[in-house]
Amino acid sequence: VKTRNRKIVMPVTEVVPKKEFFDYEAKYTEGLSDEITPARFSEELTNRIQELSSEIYDILGCRGIVRVDFIVTHDGPQFLEINTIPGMTPESIIPRQAAVFGISQTDLYSMVIEDLFTMV
């Protein structure tokens, strides 16, 4: 999230599917996956994911809220995709990450809206 000319990198969320693959059914059927924030990763892995997310955000020239997804393998984090319009329902990942970071959903929206005025 880039707000008020400052970038905030949210806590990492670990998605643990209860099926072999994290497919549409696993994502949208209650009980078929767990979303754990903050992730149960080592500090080193968490920092690497946050650094990569920040670099990708800058390289792509992002503004506002995005979600950067990775798959973590034995070789480390592998970039999967960037969601430039991530879900923002109370059940979505970004609002939960913001809450863990200490930012309410209302404050999160306010920061992004205020940042839009710096573009003018």
Regions found by a protein language model. Give the residues of each.
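Generic C-terminus detector
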Residues: 92-95, 99-120
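Phosphate-binding site of ATP-dependent enzymes
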Residues: 1-51, 72, 77-78
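Conserved metal-phosphate-binding beta-hairpin within the catalytic cores
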Residues: 1, 57-90, 98
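Short amphipathic alpha-helical segments
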Residues: 50, 54, 109-110
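Cytochrome P450 core scaffold surrounding the K-helix E-X-X-R motif
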Residues: 21, 89-93
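Active-site anion/phosphate-binding pocket segments in diverse small-molecule metabolic enzymes
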Residues: 11-13, 52-59, 63
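Peripheral (often C-terminal) accessory segments that flank ATP-dependent C-N-forming ligase machineries
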Residues: 44-47, 59-60, 65-67, 71-74, ...
